[in-house]
């Protein structure tokens, strides 16, 4: 379909473009920015006056829950929710049942994602078989089946020698490894950041060193092996400082934070609401400020939803017996726009951290508005507001922001030039 988007404020962080202009789309691609090509006649037009057109958002951490946990979410339901949040490309972590450690599981996920057609899906393969941290998964076969990177989630390698061998092997084939750096022994049994709030509530704590000790080890191993590395879900100011030091000495590492870590702190736990039970945990205001500064400076180049949908029962037990995670991909753009509203980031910088930054971190063909490139576009109204939860597409309603009025409304999400969400 030939489509013209007329009169939008077009922001493309990767090229620095920020102007009111038109976008013309044909055969899944952007064929022109500005004037239409000679002979181009649009079959469909979108009047985008007053709207911002940006690269479709790229989310590096969206649990789709299939296969194995379809009571929490399905590939169809969670990609539909992602499209509503402005997302056109997403990565799904390997913690499925069975684990994403064989090409058969990768192919199943990709087939169901294509069938749903809501967003592009890029699987992250397991670094070790069954995520047990003991035996290396078949990384090359997984890459050939469509996995774009490899990680072990929060299931850490207990044996550093085994991890080192895995990194050496990944480096040989130029594969990207995703680290969720958390020391198993220091974090074990913890439910909240080890500090005043946890003490007051009587909750077992997870010290900041659970992150920083593991992160220091992982950075040294990355330096030794030369593997391409991305650090995911950082939570502490000292953690991002370690990333900044590594980058300053020339280590090519990238990092992301969960959006909710830029908004919430451990003070949210004060009434024991399980909606704020997340792993790794919410930390202090000083940590949140450190994360915000790292996002602003570009030390952290990606913001992800870290979307973890759950069925209602998973959050109904006493705090310690509930399952951690927030369902948030559906609100990715409006929730992120609170950072602009609060003066923490300007709009082009925010969009860079939600599109070009994550795409570059994992070398994904996404995150840009370029002639000849895929027509993956989000159109949003920055002056309107979204009441979170008025419509809800994710199977997981475990979201503490439901009922809040958030800045901006996603009007259209286009994947390969096809409208996958409209509001």
Question: Residues of each region from the PLM?
Answer:
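N-terminal metal-binding scaffold of metallo-dependent hydrolase/deaminase domains
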Residues: 1-40
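Divalent metal-coordination and catalytic microenvironments
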Residues: 8, 23, 28, 50, ...
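Active-site metal-binding motif and surrounding structural segment of the metallo-beta-lactamase
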Residues: 37-53
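Metal-associated gating/positioning segment near the N- to mid-region
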Residues: 49-116
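Alpha-helix-loop-beta-strand connector modules within alpha/beta enzyme cores
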Residues: 103-120, 168-179, 331
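Histidine/acidic residue-rich metal-binding segments in metalloenzymes
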Residues: 134-303
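His/Asp/Glu-enriched, well-ordered alpha-helical/loop segment
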Residues: 200-228, 275, 296-297, 301-303, ...
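C-terminal cap of metal-dependent C-N hydrolases
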Residues: 318, 374-423
């Amino acid at each position: 379909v030939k489509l013209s988007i007329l009169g939008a404020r077009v922001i493309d962080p990767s090229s620095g473009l920020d102007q009111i202009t038109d976008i013309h789309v044909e055969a899944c691609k952007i064929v022109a920015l500005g004037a239409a090509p000679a002979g181009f006649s649009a079959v469909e037009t979108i009047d985008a006056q007053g709207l911002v057109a940006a690269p479709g958002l790229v989310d590096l951490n969206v649990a789709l829950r299939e296969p194995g946990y379809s009571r929490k979410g399905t590939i169809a339901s969670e990609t539909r929710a992602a499209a509503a949040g402005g997302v056109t490309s997403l990565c799904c972590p390997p913690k499925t049942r069975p684990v994403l450690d064989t090409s058969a599981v990768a192919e199943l996920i990709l087939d169901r994602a294509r069938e749903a057609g809501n967003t592009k899906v890029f699987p992250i393969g397991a670094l070790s078989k069954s995520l047990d941290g003991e035996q290396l998964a078949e990384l090359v076969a997984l890459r050939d089946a469509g996995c774009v990177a490899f990680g072990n989630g929060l299931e850490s390698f207990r044996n550093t020698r085994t991890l080192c061998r895995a990194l050496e092997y990944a480096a040989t084939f130029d594969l990207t490894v995703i680290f969720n750096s958390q020391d198993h022994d220091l974090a074990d049994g913890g439910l909240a950041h080890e500090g005043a709030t946890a003490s007051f509530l009587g909750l077992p704590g997870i010290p900041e060193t659970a992150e920083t000790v593991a992160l220091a080890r992982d950075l040294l191993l990355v330096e030794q092996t030369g593997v391409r590395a991305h650090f995911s879900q950082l939570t502490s100011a000292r953690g991002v400082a370690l990333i900044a030091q590594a980058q300053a000495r020339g280590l090519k590492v990238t990092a992301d934070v969960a959006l909710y870590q830029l908004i919430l702190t451990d003070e949210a736990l004060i009434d024991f609401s399980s909606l704020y039970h997340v792993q790794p945990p919410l930390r202090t205001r000083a940590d949140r400020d450190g994360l915000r500064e790292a996002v602003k400076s570009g030390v952290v180049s990606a913001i992800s939803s870290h979307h973890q949908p759950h069925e209602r029962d998973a959050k109904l037990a006493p705090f310690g017996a509930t399952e951690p995670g927030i369902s948030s991909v559906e609100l990715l753009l409006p929730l992120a726009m609170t950072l602009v509203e609060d003066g923490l980031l300007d709009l082009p910088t925010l969009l860079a951290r939600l599109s070009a930054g994550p795409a570059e971190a994992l070398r994904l063909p996404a995150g840009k508005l370029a002639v000849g490139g895929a027509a993956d576009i989000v159109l949003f109204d920055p002056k309107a507001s979204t009441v979170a939860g008025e419509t809800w597409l994710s199977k997981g309603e475990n979201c503490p922001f439901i009922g809040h009025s958030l800045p901006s409304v996603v009007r259209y999400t286009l994947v390969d030039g096809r409208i996958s969400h409209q509001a």
